[in-house]
Amino acid sequence: MGLSMAPKGKYEQSHWAIKVLQWVGSVLLLSMFAAGSIFFFEQPLSINALKWVQFIQSTAMFLLPPLCMAYLWSKQPLDWLKVKGERLKVKGESLWAVMLMLVALPAINLLGHLNQQMTLPTFLEPLEQWMKTSEESAKVLTEQFLNVTTFGGLMINILLMALLPAVGEELTFRGVLMNLFRVKGKRLKVKGEGVPHLAIWCSAILFSAIHMQFYGFVPRMLMGALFGYMLVWTGSLWIPILMHFTNNAMAVILYFVALREGWDMEQVDAIGTNDTLWLGIVSMVITIVGIYAFRRSTTMSNASSRISSGN
């Protein structure tokens, strides 16, 4: 039976392992179709063609599978994904989320700098060399994508490198995978409140690993965990999506401005490290305090809402 004919929530009661297989199968199947898109462009691929391929592959891997799975696994798919319309009404939480990501930029740079100091044992030298080569290849391709100086090119890059990954990856890692891990894993208790730590950290590790950028693994994993906790605290996937978008869009816009103004991008990336190490430390402290304050604020707000509703 085709997806269009399948009733909502048809596999809602399916075993956890069956759902995992369905999700993996949908990703593989759609990715295979997306991979075929490369043959519709002239070879060798131009940067514009590569951007089209990236758009198609990102949509196939991260955007469509979560939507399909949510439809098959729940009678209320948007609510299951935590993206239902009323969840947009998050008041000041959106501003909190954006400010946190802006303040955290030097701290993210510092964590990335520390991550890059990682060295593997001598017997793993071939693996380390492969990791460095992969990292450099990814960096070169990213810089080619970002190498635009027109506002039209900037808008395309924001769509391709900020908006699409933010929506697709959050639907995948916080929407689907965190839900699956949450069902399978045992809930740990923190001060009497159920918080799915296992689900949050497992999805965060996979989120970082899928990028195949090993020297940025730690900061990306920590961001993934933060996005997971934000989802739990607010009950809305739109907050992690907004934070993810803010982080990616900042990088795209900074690179664009650097090209137009002739800035040294390496110095921009080094903010919070070396000569500005103090800024990275201050940023980290403010970010941690901000996260704690956000959690207290949302906890109190949720408690107030429950009292007002008579629960």
Whereabouts are the PLM-identified features?
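Alpha-helical transmembrane segments in multi-pass membrane proteins
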Residues: 33-75, 93-102, 122-133
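Transmembrane alpha-helical segments in integral membrane proteins
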Residues: 63-74, 154-181, 286-297
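Hydrophobic alpha-helical membrane-insertion segments
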Residues: 23-34, 95-119, 232-249
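Functionally important transmembrane alpha-helices
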Residues: 201-271
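Juxtamembrane helix-loop-helix connectors linking adjacent transmembrane helices
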Residues: 50, 80-164, 183, 309-311
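Membrane-interface helix/loop boundary segments of multi-pass membrane proteins
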Residues: 168-202, 229-236
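C-terminal membrane module of polytopic membrane proteins
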Residues: 245-311
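Hydrophobic core of alpha-helical transmembrane segments in multi-pass integral membrane proteins
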Residues: 26-37, 62-68, 101-104, 277-296
